[in-house]
């Protein structure tokens, strides 16, 4: 929440420290025994393509550096706390009470974030509907949320954080970011190379400002009988479509 309700979260160095103090590998291990992907950006791997057919996530990873580095996190946190005029800070992180993954995720976040001197982390769990309402109303300090792609393009995720997006629950504002997304969705929309460059720039701005903290990319394992044919799998929307599915006699 960057509305100013939480003193400290409007400081970029403090947010950067929280990102660096997030052990995504341990979170993936606790949530799915390592099945879920370790994010290198906001846009998950396998969703969108570059102009040359490569994975957009790999292109974006060259502009970001999401990594667990507690030593650097402590340094930035100390600098940020001094700039904010704080000696101690307590953060409440909200998750969904009817989700086992929320508990595992918040436990790991609490464990690593509290390595930052002067920081106390409290966990708060509410029902799913309440969590959605709290996010929409800005009634949170830090909140664990998720998103499923509506279409196979990076802007389905990156568009969440423009200043006028109804899904920008943290109320982070960046004119530079808005310009990058606006360019990707308007003047560069039909120019793949230019559009991808805009989207990579947006990923870089998100990372540099620590406007969001991606903790894991969800991977969904599926066990399919080899006799079942014709199932269509997509990286966006409903994911799997069975309209053409059939059982082979072979």
Provide a role label for each language-model segment.
Residues 8, 26-31, 129-163, 206-207:
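Pocket-flanking alpha-helical
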Residues 11, 15, 19, 24, ...:
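Extracytoplasmic/secreted envelope proteins and their assembly/folding machinery
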Residues 13-16, 28-29, 65-66, 120-131, ...:
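Extracytoplasmic/peripheral linker and loop segments enriched in polar/acidic and small residues
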Residues 38-79, 99-102, 190:
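Structural transition elements
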Residues 78-149, 220:
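Ligand/substrate-recognition segments at binding pockets and active sites
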């Amino acid at each position: 929440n960057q509305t100013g309700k939480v003193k400290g979260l409007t400081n970029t160095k403090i947010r950067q420290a929280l990102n660096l103090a997030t052990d995504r590998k341990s979170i993936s291990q606790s949530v799915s025994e390592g099945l879920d992907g370790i994010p290198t950006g906001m846009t998950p791997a396998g969703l969108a393509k570059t102009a040359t057919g490569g994975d957009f996530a790999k292109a974006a990873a060259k502009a970001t550096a999401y990594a667990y580095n507690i030593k650097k996190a402590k340094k930035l946190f100390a600098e940020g706390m001094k700039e904010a005029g704080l000696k101690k800070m307590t953060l409440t992180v909200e998750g969904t009470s009817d989700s086992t993954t929320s508990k595992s995720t918040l436990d790991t976040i609490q464990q690593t974030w509290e390595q930052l001197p002067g920081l106390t982390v409290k966990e708060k769990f509410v029902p799913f509907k309440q969590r959605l309402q709290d996010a929409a109303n800005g009634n949170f300090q830090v909140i664990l949320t998720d998103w499923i792609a509506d279409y196979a393009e990076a802007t389905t995720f990156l568009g969440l954080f423009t200043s006028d997006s109804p899904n920008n629950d943290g109320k982070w504002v960046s004119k530079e970011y808005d310009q990058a997304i606006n360019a990707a969705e308007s003047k560069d929309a039909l120019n793949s190379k230019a559009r991808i460059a805009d989207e990579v720039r947006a990923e870089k701005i998100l990372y540099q400002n620590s406007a969001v903290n991606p903790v894991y990319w969800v991977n969904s394992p599926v066990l399919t009988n080899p006799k079942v044919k014709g199932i269509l799998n997509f990286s966006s929307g409903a994911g799997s479509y069975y309209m053409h599915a059939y059982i082979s006699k072979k």
